[in-house]
């Protein structure tokens, strides 16, 4: 569910994995792993994602 929402929101906002990685201070590979469901971001990164996409947690 998280991975699907992340992909959908990123595409809706027309951002690349690189764009999100730069805003969060992580690697593009980290974003790719989140979108693949291999790992999930910590709470601080989730809060930052919510701010970027203007959604609530």
Each model region followed by its residue ranges:
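Short, Lys/Arg-enriched C-terminal cap helix and immediately downstream tail that follows
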Residues: 7, 43-44
